[in-house]
Structures are given as structure tokens and as C-alpha cells.
């Protein structure tokens, strides 16, 4: 099975990195954590930008670094996208892409035309970087990284320097990379929204350590992680648009375990879509509530309960069929309902965020 194995130890003044993990060789793996958690340092170690004496790195069994072997960055078949688009100002967009092609080695995994089409930059090829918007520059930087025909693409918070409008413009292009290219992506981010929208796998980091790693949906639904805290705690579901009710302007999203109704956004029936359900938008009941404004009522079973940092709050994980959902309750409510593990409950979902 294709995979990336990374083991690094750094002990710098004021910072320590100690990781030993295996990353999947397919899909998008998000390295997630707060600033200073070590995610960018780990990415730079994988790229060979940081040379760490105590380290070992293999890609699909091929050694890139150990006690005796060191493959320098320029000889590693990888593409790297920084926070700021580092384009050559004296070259046109096409010139920047051709520069990337010069670094390509081995079989062509992504052609120049394919990179241009995937990132939607065909109309920009004759422009210099100073005539591009921030989002356009970053799309060109990603296309140049792909022009290297990399075996793995490393992305260090590529949207961090962009405003919200530019982020929304570029996210669909990142989704296309995920859907149309068979190249593993390691994606550094501290944004739960980006992670929920793009990632297949999650590596959560804190103070230079990996505190959790695994498939995105199951890892986000864990209750023993600091990432569960705050307003961003929630679950991710992969759904399919099952019906559009034009009379009420609603759409039904079917997922393993049930269905959710949400505002109709014109997405065609049959389209696969990822949705995010925040814990603050979920409540629980012992009996089905008939007279309520909440449209989404699902049958579930309590799977786990965990205290929050706030003494008055608890986080409850409920399984709806195969799918986990999180609910944030006051402890008073949990006590009044007699919430215990294994109990059957009605899950009331007030709001659903479409990751599109």
C-alpha cells in the first residue's frame, strides 16, 4: 500500500517537534492545529527544507532520509506551495509555469495544459505577476507546483494570505485537484472550514506532537481531543442530493443513516456533496417533537459523553446509522434528559453547512 512514513525529532530553544506517523499515499491529508503547533515545521521537514539529523522519511518504501541517505529538496519529486505566491516577477505566467517544468523528473503526471485547465488560468498566461489578483497569483503558484509533475504536493496554508472573497474563489479549484488528480496532498491549515471541505484524512497537532490522526469524519468526531472545543466543534458527512422540493425551495441530502433538509441552492439531484453539522446546531430529545420548527429529526443512539472545559457544558456523540454527530448540551439538560451511553434519542439538527 502506498504511504508516507515520517519520523522527526527536533529540540530547538523554545520549540520541540516529536512525530512518528504514517500518512496515506492518496487523497488530501490536512495537518491541522493552532499557530506554533508544528504543522509547518513538519511539512518543511518532509520537503527537506529543514534538515533534521534525527529523522527518517520514506515515500512508498523509497528512502528520502535516514541516518545514511539524504535526498536534497531539489531532487525530491514534490511540489511546494507557500502561503505567499513566490512567482518570478520578471516572467509571465507561462514563463513561471515553464520554469516549473524544468524541474520535472520521471514520468509526466500532470501536463502543462492540464495544470492550466485545472486552475483556470488560460486567460492569464501572458500576464506578469504584478497584473494578477492575490487569488490569481496563488492559482498560478499551484499550477507551477503541478508542472513539476510531483509525486506529492505540499501546501502550506495556501489561502492564509487571501481575503474571504479570494478564498471562496480558489476553493473550487482545490476541490478539482482532489477530484481529478491521483497525487497525494499534504495540506497545512488552521481553518476548520478548509479542513472540513477539502480533507480526507486529518493529522491534529499540538505543541510539536501528533495528538490524533485518521480518517477525517471519525477523527473530527472524537471527544478526547482539544480540537473538539470551541464553536467549531462538529461533524462532517458525505451526502448526496436526493430531492429538490421546488414548492418550498428545499433540498434533501441523503447520508448513511438518514436525510437532512436544507435550503435549495440549485445543486442537481444525484450530486455528491459534503456537509458540516456544528455541535451548537444540534439538540437532543427523549421523544420525537412534533410541534417544532426544526425540520431535521433523526433517530440516533448515544455513543459517548465528554465534559467540556466549561463546567456547565458537555459534548455528546450520537450515532445516526453509521454516521457520528456531535451535540453540545448544558449539563443540566443532559441530566434532565438522563443522557447515558447506549440510550436512544431524537437528534434535532437546526442548521447544515454545505461545503461547496
Swiss-Prot record:
**Example of a GO MF term:** ABC-type molybdate transporter activity
Per the record, membrane topology reads:
Peripheral membrane protein
Q: What reaction is this protein's catalytic activity?
A: molybdate(out) + ATP + H2O = molybdate(in) + ADP + phosphate + H(+)
Q: Which sites bind ATP?
A: 33-40
Any keyword Magnesium? no
Signal peptide (UniProt feature, chain positions): none
**Entry EC no(s):** 7.3.2.5
Show the PROSITE patterns listed in the entry. ABC_TRANSPORTER_1 (PS00211), ABC_TRANSPORTER_2 (PS50893), MODC (PS51241), MOP (PS51866)
What is its subcellular localisation?
Cell inner membrane
Coiled coil: which residue ranges? none
Residues covered by the Mop domain = 291-356
Which InterPro entries does the annotation name? AAA+_ATPase, ABC_transporter-like_ATP-bd, ABC_transporter-like_CS, Mo/tungstate-bd_C_term_dom, ModC_ABC_ATP-bd, Molybdenum_import_ModC, Mop_domain, P-loop_NTPase
Domain ABC transporter, by residue range, is: 1-232
Q: Which GO terms describe its cellular component?
A: plasma membrane
Q: Does the keyword Cell inner membrane apply?
A: yes
| UniProt superkingdom | Bacteria
Q: Which UniProt keywords apply?
A: ATP-binding, Cell inner membrane, Cell membrane, Membrane, Molybdenum, Nucleotide-binding, Translocase, Transport
Assembly description: The complex is composed of two ATP-binding proteins (ModC), two transmembrane proteins (ModB) and a solute-binding protein (ModA).
What job does this protein perform? Answer: Part of the ABC transporter complex ModABC involved in molybdenum import. Responsible for energy coupling to the transport system.
Protein family: Belongs to the ABC transporter superfamily. Molybdate importer (TC 3.A.1.8) family.
Would you tell me the protein name for this molecule? Molybdenum import ATP-binding protein ModC
| Organism annotation | Methylococcus capsulatus (strain ATCC 33009 / NCIMB 11132 / Bath)
Amino acid at each position: 500500500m502506498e504511504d508516507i512514513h515520517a519520523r522527526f525529532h527536533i529540540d530547538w530553544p523554545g520549540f520541540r517537534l516529536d512525530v512518528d506517523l504514517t500518512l496515506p499515499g492518496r487523497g488530501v491529508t490536512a495537518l491541522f492545529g493552532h499557530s506554533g503547533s508544528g504543522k509547518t515545521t513538519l511539512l518543511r521537514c518532509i520537503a527537506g527544507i529543514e534538515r533534521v539529523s534525527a529523522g527518517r522519511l520514506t515515500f512508498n518504501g523509497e528512502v528520502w532520509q535516514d541516518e545514511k541517505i539524504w535526498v536534497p529538496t531539489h531532487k525530491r519529486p514534490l511540489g511546494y506551495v507557500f502561503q505567499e505566491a513566490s512567482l518570478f516577477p520578471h516572467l509571465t505566467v507561462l514563463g513561471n509555469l515553464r520554469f516549473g517544468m524544468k524541474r520535472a523528473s520521471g514520468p509526466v503526471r500532470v501536463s502543462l495544459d492540464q495544470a492550466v485547465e485545472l486552475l483556470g488560468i488560460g486567460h492569464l498566461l501572458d500576464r506578469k505577476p504584478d497584473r494578477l489578483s492575490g487569488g490569481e497569483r496563488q492559482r498560478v503558484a499551484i499550477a507551477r507546483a503541478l508542472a513539476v509533475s510531483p509525486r506529492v504536493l505540499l501546501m502550506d496554508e495556501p489561502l492564509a494570505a487571501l481575503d474571504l472573497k479570494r478564498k471562496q474563489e480558489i476553493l473550487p479549484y482545490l476541490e478539482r485537484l482532489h477530484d481529478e488528480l491521483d497525487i497525494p496532498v499534504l495540506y497545512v491549515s488552521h481553518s476548520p472550514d478548509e479542513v472540513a471541505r477539502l480533507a480526507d484524512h486529518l493529522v491534529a497537532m499540538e505543541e510539536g506532537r501528533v495528538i490524533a490522526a485518521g480518517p477525517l469524519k471519525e477523527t473530527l468526531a472524537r471527544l478526547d481531543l482539544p480540537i473538539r472545543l470551541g464553536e467549531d466543534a462538529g461533524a462532517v458527512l458525505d451526502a448526496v442530493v436526493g430531492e429538490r422540493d421546488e414548492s418550498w425551495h428545499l433540498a434533501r441530502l441523503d447520508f448513511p443513516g438518514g436525510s437532512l433538509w436544507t435550503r435549495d441552492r440549485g445543486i442537481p439531484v444525484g450530486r455528491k456533496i459534503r456537509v458540516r453539522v456544528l455541535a451548537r446546531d444540534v439538540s437532543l430529545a427523549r421523544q420525537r417533537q412534533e410541534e417544532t420548527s426544526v425540520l431535521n429529526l433523526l433517530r440516533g443512539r448515544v455513543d459517548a459523553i465528554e465534559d467540556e472545559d466549561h463546567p456547565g457544558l458537555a459534548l455528546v456523540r450520537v450515532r445516526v446509522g453509521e454516521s457520528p454527530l456531535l451535540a453540545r448540551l448544558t449539563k443540566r439538560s443532559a441530566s434532565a434528559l438522563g443522557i447515558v451511553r447506549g440510550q436512544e434519542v431524537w437528534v434535532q439538527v437546526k442548521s447544515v453547512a454545505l461545503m461547496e
